[in-house]
């Protein structure tokens, strides 16, 4: 049974994230979306709110689940019997950051394998940061985030503004 | 009549910005310098101060004007009957950021065209951030910012320091 | 009257090229597609065949024409009263090559301005080289090259194979 | 049963290739090494010689096999009931080439998924080209190619020289 | 007598930094490690603490010393009769930042020469930022920072956490 | 006595090469320009012609000499009591190629240190290839190659054309 972990901030989940989840669910037996609790970064959504948004959009995938975690990612993977981590790649900037991160994780736990997927073309320019900016400035975020959570993002953007 | 918008923070305007403005003024009938009001980022100069500095240095160009704006850039362009945006490119890092931003703008308004110019060689290493650091540390900023505003930048750097 | 030149090998023209031509035709008064005669590189199509393929696909644009040229690009532009060159950008690799080429052209003729457009998302992975490989191996090239010239490319690929 | 294909030229197989094969064999149920027959490129080793070298070094992995193939990669995968392709990533240059290739393959067959692994640190500077150059100039290729095939590479380099 | 300055934040010094110091000490007659006092950035260690950590790990090198400095780097170099600055390069991101910084320094003082060394392979993924994160999350930092200062970093990480 | 080797094809030497030679001559006690004899690549100038052109332009530097060499670069350095190699860096593309080459050289001879200098701004877009193309197409190569050898390059370009 191949269990893969897909870690990130997901503040909020975007169609780019969902694209990776959907494709990974066909390559691995089980996919766990891991929402990182980062004490140094206050996001737009709380960690619990992010987990809730993800739960709603992964319903169509019966081999995908979601949990939040804190501390070292390699420890979270070990606790869930997983030695494969999935990461999306959109650009050269992503590539260099991910190369350094995967080498550090390999140093911390040589059994952990990081596997990458290129984000699908139509989502390759998406980032949670860019989407939050568009939402705060009142732009249309249709096709950028899953339809089920558009209202949640616009409501939060108003509070933020 | 081809109206092009050149958006940015311009905190402060540098010789690299002025180089793009001068070259764009020969390619398009009218150029509007758009100073973005970004509530999340407090700069060295206020937005009004930046607009004033730009007004002083664009005097030689009779087809160039300046305005500040807030909200979505594509809306600002629409209000000024412009469907062409100009951006300068200095490095690979610029390129990737601009690629993602131009694709998001295209998503928000398919009629908007982003056109890029490579910054001239002698200005390719300039950034407002680097110039502010040199000024704060008492370095010489001649040839980095237009001569007309050197004193303004040094005075502001002293307040900042 | 703003005349812009769009130079390249076009061996053959792809939907990525046509995308740039179509968008440039809305930004400039006249666009001249310049097919470079490069004695050092024997392509799949002869230069005349490439010019003919381009003529067929630019019919919908009344402000776009095509010519072949040899020698220095800056001289070809001068002979056509143009001081603006358009180039498409798909990737970091493109960016660096284009940065060096545009700086060399600026050196040869300081009046020449190179203006860049990012290739539209859906064409950002296209290159004449990749399309020729797919055609030679019998793959489907629909949506990769303009419909009008699909048969020409497949016929040439067979000869080539 | 998850079957993954690892395609390449392998002229010759390097320790970087073997590193990817070994790690992939722990992530997927079956791994097929596919040696591409490229009529346009004459290598140092013939395709059959490359297949033979690979056979010798993959003996320790009971879920790994090797075949040569010609034509489109997506067709080769379909004939082997595989919808997952593995590719190694060493550098930014690799990343951009692989991004364009994976998008073209996705266009040719939307069911094909390309999954990437970063080459392990100690092999990240290896390429068949660089190793052939070192061998032709009489340099030491220990730790660059699997021990079992060092003599084959040095013998071929002498013929080549 | 060739005096080279190796400037940085060193918050804290890593094995990547020490690798550059060791190799530079064989190329230049004297190496001065310069710890930059940056009023805008509060680090994990104070500047004095960083100088102390460096003093302990450079003991084996009799031609290497350490000082903190504030203001312009080119002025610090002039005060120490040095016109050569050493910088380490790990990635494309480093390269672009360093290219712009070295061109700005050349502008401020044409006599200053920046010389670069590629970080050794086994340290190429290290950064003070990544190491602090691992330490704060209780991960093992052996082989990431010099053995002599591991306890200092873990103690500081606890305070930080 | 610090002896540094500056290896390359130099087909022909450009002002970018001369810029690196001039700056390196101030950092190291002796600089040897090494012209690589590459059997696989036929250049515009023969190796002897390249050595002659270099001899003419390095006359102002009394600590700079030139030799051609074949085989492994690390062996050439050892024969000249040098453990420092100088390379110029112009772009991200250069950086990645040089990173892999320097790591391979380090593998072949751990005592060899590769030291890099960023090409000066005004020469950052120069390459022997681009200059040869401009010369073959009859463009002006003043300020691109040293004045002393302009006629040699134009004469050779005519033969080539």
Swiss-Prot record, chains A, B, C, D, E, F:
It holds the Pfam family CTP_transf_like. The record marks 17 as: Transition state stabilizer. Substrate binds at residues 9, 41, 73, 87. Keywords: ATP-binding, Coenzyme A biosynthesis, Cytoplasm, Magnesium, Nucleotide-binding, Nucleotidyltransferase, Transferase. It is found in: Cytoplasm. Its cofactor is Mg(2+). Its EC number is 2.7.7.3. The keyword NAD does not apply. ATP binds at residues 9-10, 17, 88-90, 98, 123-129. It catalyses: (R)-4'-phosphopantetheine + ATP + H(+) = 3'-dephospho-CoA + diphosphate. GO terms for cellular component: cytoplasm. One of its GO terms (biological process) is coenzyme A biosynthetic process. Reversibly transfers an adenylyl group from ATP to 4'-phosphopantetheine, yielding dephospho-CoA (dPCoA) and pyrophosphate. Homohexamer. PANTHER family: PHOSPHOPANTETHEINE ADENYLYLTRANSFERASE. HAMAP family: PPAT_bact. Belongs to the bacterial CoaD family. This is Phosphopantetheine adenylyltransferase. It comes from Clostridium acetobutylicum (strain ATCC 824 / DSM 792 / JCM 1419 / IAM 19013 / LMG 5710 / NBRC 13948 / NRRL B-527 / VKM B-1787 / 2291 / W). The lineage of its organism: Bacteria, Bacillati, Bacillota, Clostridia, Eubacteriales.
